Amino acid sequence: MFWLLALLAYLLGSLSFAIVLSRLSGSPDPRSCGSGNAGATNMLRLAGRKMAILTLLGDLCKGLLPVMLARLAGLDLQEQAWVGVCAVLGHLFPVYFRFQGGKGVATAAGMLMGLYFPAALLAIAAWLLTFYLTRTSSLAALIATPLTLPLLAWREPAALLPISVLTVMIVWRHRNNLRDLFAGRERHF
């Protein structure tokens, strides 16, 4: 059952709401415009608030839904977390869109909502505060993502390894943003 749910999570994660919504709305493909990222932040730049909110909600749901299905199927917490990681992998490397996806932040937040809601609230609050102070989405993601690790280590240690892998994946996807942050070239809102 685990492998079936992991595969389904990857396939669901591969549905890129940014790409689909950009096509439906006649907006530019987010992979080739703006930051080049197929995610909610770039959709805000390219297609406006409504498309960005729809992208965000879709990306959150594709992280949450597989974890909830894994829970309903009776998988333990660590297996649920790995299923969620598969959804994020699908977002990062979507099979339907030549493996060119987003950075996984919203999908990871949805996954955390299903695993341990207080960790998701912590990450979202940290993201919002950092974004408010810096107006830099990538910096907000790079600060918010690892903040969940101590809380999970304390409250849900079974999820620590998958969430650690997830954190590394998200930081790796932000490697160009890190270079731009250190060089003072990162985009701000």
From Swiss-Prot:
The protein here is known as Glycerol-3-phosphate acyltransferase
- Catalyzed reactions: an acyl phosphate + sn-glycerol 3-phosphate = a 1-acyl-sn-glycero-3-phosphate + phosphate
Q: How does it assemble?
A: Probably interacts with PlsX.
Write one Gene Ontology MF term: acyl-phosphate glycerol-3-phosphate acyltransferase activity
Name the family.
Belongs to the PlsY family.
Can you tell me where the transmembrane regions are? 1-21, 77-97, 111-131, 151-171
One GO biological-process annotation of the entry reads: phospholipid biosynthetic process
What gene makes this protein? plsY
Which SMART domains does this one have?
G3P_acyltransf (SM01207)
Q: Where in the cell is it found?
A: Cell inner membrane
Q: What is the membrane topology listed in the Swiss-Prot or TrEMBL record?
A: Multi-pass membrane protein
Q: Tell me the pathway.
A: Lipid metabolism; phospholipid metabolism
Q: What is its EC number?
A: 2.3.1.275
